[in-house]
Design a protein with these regions (language model features):
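Intrinsic low-complexity, intrinsically disordered or marginally ordered coil/linker segments
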Residues: 1-136
């Protein structure tokens, strides 16, 4: 279910993808103790070698203010798990994003690349985003 308007999940960007080719993870994030809402987020970050590196950086991001604190000052504890992963190629000159392959670490996830492409179309509306389950 989509997060409520006042949910701290709304502070977490859905799609963060750097230029060039990177391994990516698709992760589900929720606020600890609140199973009624969750979001899917994509991370393909510069300087990461492995899918797990992207997940580790996402976990660091979730602990950093202001995402870890509500407007009332109450601390949030975010919980995340990897749904799947693959590769993303972002070409800023051509304004294209390609999602493909799978993660050997986290396994093949049916629909993962398609869901990732949907998230990236919203995050990067000026880019043409395509997906495929081909490749590694």
């Amino acid at each position: 279910r989509e997060p409520r308007d006042d949910s701290p999940l709304r502070l977490i960007p859905r799609g963060v993808v750097y230029s060039l080719v990177w391994k990516y993870v698709l992760a589900q994030v929720r606020v600890e103790g609140r199973d009624d809402e969750a979001i899917l987020v994509v991370r393909a970050l510069r300087g990461t070698t492995w899918h797990a590196d992207n997940f580790a950086r996402l976990r660091e991001e979730m602990r950093a203010p202001p995402r870890s604190t509500t407007t009332t000052g109450k601390e949030n504890a975010f919980v995340a798990f990897v749904v799947g992963g693959g590769r993303i190629e972002r070409d800023d000159e051509a304004k294209t994003i390609s999602v493909y392959g799978y993660s050997k670490t986290f396994g093949r996830c049916p629909g993962c690349n398609e869901r990732t492409a949907i998230i990236l179309r919203e995050a990067f509306p000026e880019y043409e985003t395509t997906w495929s389950d081909d490749g590694y």
